[in-house]
């Protein structure tokens, strides 16, 4: 009975959250139908839904499986002295709550992360339908179409990945903290081998994504507003460019 009640309130919450979007969507459909451009509406809607489902599912998988892996870490680990340690409930009390809430919370986060990614549908649609301009920029020797069609989509993807990985690292570290895989006591921070390896892998992926972001930032020099003229100046090229 409790499970059915929880499911009912969860569904009601989703209906309240997405009701406004459904009304707006229906209004747009009526307008496009009136002017005879329903094919454009259905094409963009299909692309948005596809993006939302793909990125929402990826976000769900990131959160769910990493937290699940942390929650299933071995429990037979040594405990630090409790004099200055963080006061937390025992893993035996936390485990049933984590197991009960993990799936619905991960689904809910995925439902919010998917539409956020889908809001960049125009950039991604241009990315998949880019055409060359036949003119290269003088600094990086890239076709101008890269800056019009590809760079905005790559920047949006980078921002989504940094947010998703950052939240995953925080959720995973907090789970290890609850299960005593990460502890803080008088002798400093203690991590089990399982927690250390898991978190280091996530941080390594995060840093790789950040490195990709710094690489993308170099192309932003062409939009630099420093100096007397708009674009990459002498200082940008010889001082700021890696």
Residue ranges: model-predicted function:
Residues 36:
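Glycine-centered flexible beta-alpha turn that most often forms the glycine-rich phosphate-binding loop
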Residues 145:
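Glycine-rich, often proline-containing surface loops adjacent to acidic residues and nearby aromatics
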Residues 1-30, 39-142, 151, 155-242:
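Contiguous transmembrane helix-bundle modules in multi-pass membrane proteins
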